[in-house]
Amino acid sequence: MISLVFGDALARSFPFGSRTRNVNDLGNQFVPYHAHLWDMLHGEADGDVLVNWQSGYGSSFLPDLGTYLTSPFAVLVGLFPRDEIDLAVYVISVLKIATAGAVMAWLLRTVRTGPWWVAGALGASYALCGWTLATAVYNPMWLDGLIALPLLCLVGEWALARRRTITGALLVAVAWMANFYTAYMATIGAALFVIARLVIDRPAHVVTAVSGPPRGSTRTAANAERETAAEHPATEPATAADDAGPDDVGSDRGTPTVGLAGSPASAPRPSVPRLLGELWRPLVTLLLGVGLAAPLVSVIYAGTGEAYPGRDTEFVAEPWQDVFARLLPGGYGYNSPSLYVDTVALLLALTLPFNTAVPRRVRYGWSALVVAVLLSFQWKPTHLAWHAFTTPNGSQFRQTFVLCALLVIAAWLSLAYARPTWRALLGGGGVLAALTLTARDSQLLYAWSVPIMLAGAATLALALALWRFADARRRPVLVVLAAVLLVGMQVGQSAATLAVSDRKRLAHMDDYAPWGERQREQRAAIQAVDGWPAYRTEPGRQQTVGNDPMMVGGQGAQYYSSLTSDVLSRTMTALGGGWTSGGRSVQSLDNPVTDVIFSVGARLYSPPDPHQRWNPRHPGPVVTVRQKVPPLVTVRPPGPRPAYGISAYRNQELLLGARVYDVPSYTLHLTDRPQLPRTRDGGYRVPARHRAADPTAQVKAVCRPGSSVFLWAPRYWGKADLRDGRGPQADFRGDYPPKRSAAMQELGRTPANGQVRITLTALRGGSVPKGAIGCLDRGKLKAAADRLTDRGATEVSVDGATVRATVRAGSRGTAVVAMPNIKGWECAAGGSARPATSYLGLVSVPLDGKATTVSCTFQPPGLRGGAAAAGLALLGLVSIGAWRAWRARQTGRAPAGHPSTSAASHD
């Protein structure tokens, strides 16, 4: 924790300075989701655990809850004032990192006994690894995987010891529910750990259980384990004699060898296949735990199937010089594996192959495992296996914390058997020097990375010398000095590495302001006019983050999630909406037609966010505009179901049920060029304007005087303003190929002469499609809205995940609920419920003229199957508990010394 605080203070990062922490997903997703959780805990949210009514005009929330908010630490957000939401997320992140270090220290002491302060220091090395400092610190949900890995390794240890099956299964369930994505990677890492323990370390209790007690002995595996534990508490006994090399036998540096029955040859050594046969025990524990987590995991899995596909990414291996550079302090790279563990831990790990006090099988086996895992990062098939067979967008080495854990375990093994000699230190130092030499030309290193690494190596050598001298002279104060040196170097290196990461992230990632006066003003304005479910209140087009409705309130179209539904993204795109992040960050659409369609009765207009450097500086108050709109449930007349076309204007009219736009033909040319290249759909390609002297593009069209002029140009990046239209200059940010899409925007009113003249200042260029200009007749729109109101529901109520509406008697046609038809909605109109039908992407219910009520209830896909799996897992755990209770009673009745006497608690 000291390293984290010190590093953030060095970088002058929140909460210790003026620099924001909220980069990328931390600002866009994690802080807003925690704000929504705060609202839920305090009864102020619109929705429940199944439906979030504030985002995406109604989105499935349980998959988001499982993805972002089911960590046991997340509920701590409710203890903070809502205005301190950023501080709450920061404190939660720090607590997660500290917990990960503590659990790793526990695991190390379980693997083998050793000084508690060294275990604590190496636990901190793991918790403050490069993956944490460079990647996970702004993805707080991934920090649960940092805790899960050593926790699952402990569960594996218990399973091999035939202990704590129920506790282990419950901890597996907690880990998988906290964040299943990193728990999946942690499970792979824990599986490698358990296999290594069986094949390399061969724990005494497992060997005894597989081989049986020595001939003539009446001891059971459980008794052997208890006797061994009494001699060597909190660890497995050493087995160095079995595998000692010529220089190991008789050495006084290692822990004395204790056989399974008190002598080295008390039992025959089992074969590797027989040892691996014991894997069924941790496997059963894992399956029971994942089964308990199935209701959440299955919902998330189903949600990914319904999500907008986003962008395809191809895996590219990183240059080895950059990979090795990330082992050193101060290295930073967005898409390279963050392998840093402080130099103390790294050098100790590198001494393992050279530490002759460690049995050959242990030092070579664990070293080979570390190398194999590192190689798996750079090979596409194993890369895909690590990432659930999908190359992620963004960082492609999200499993790096597993390798950091293995490095720390290797460091512990090298020190726990016996402190490395000078020969081992020189061997490890030689490997470190070779790695540093390979990485010398990497652009990911700071100038001081190598000097601070050398300082760390020198500190370790000095601390080990002091420690050895203290043991020889019996001066414990020198041990304290050695500990202070080691821990001080760790704190300094990790703090410096974090400070570098904090600053470099801000240089190449989008960043967002923490909660401040802007959000307070918006939230107060929304609370003053909020009328849900009679109408929606839109937080507005000028967004602060990608999830403004969850941050400041209201019920908008804006929604950013890894699980943004395909139907929402495609529906809003068809209506002229904009998005970023490959379609998964849907933006608000400021349009009077869609406001009528989605029952938006109040809309906020805020000045551009001053935190973003590209925004114009137009300070001013937050303005709320009210309008009368149809209810949430409206009725369309009988007829064939319409289908969307190419034009966003015509698509809006289809959903509205009335013609309200004129879509004139137009011409577009540069001031010095009469002709521009055309697109295949009949539009124009607009070249980028690189200099102020470059020509602008002019658009000419004719519209009805007084009509509202809109421009729909999803692939255009630049500015647009309507001459004599008295409207503001509009910014468009659309890419091609489409990583983002620009939203349709209003430019102003058509002048009295009907001549529409639009100036395009192309910053990056792009294209303008055929039918890009729409001229809205507001009188026709009002008439259409009145008709929808007259035919719409007379009463609408929303209770959690259920919408109920009363429609007029004799209503025929289709009841349309103004929310996206995400999979899971079931509706009824006077009859039994059945899956909702789709009306241009919205939930709809057929009306036959007899029904007067319509009700729709949401149940996330995958919940039923997950609940069934959880029921079976729970039945399995209850059966195990009952069987243990029966065995305990039977054991209590058995005569003393009878062979059936065994520890039931170990079965």
Q: Predicted regions span which residues?
A:
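Membrane-embedded helix bundles of polyisoprenyl
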Residues: 97-111, 116-201, 278-300
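Perimembrane helix-loop-helix junctions
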Residues: 158, 186-286, 460-465
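Active-site-proximal, structured, solvent-exposed surfaces of multi-pass membrane proteins
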Residues: 30, 680-907
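Extracytoplasmic/lumenal acceptor-recognition loop(s) of multi-pass membrane glycoenzymes
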Residues: 492-505, 527-595, 637-649, 728-732, ...
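Contiguous transmembrane helix-bundle modules in multi-pass membrane proteins
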Residues: 368, 372-373, 390, 396-515, ...
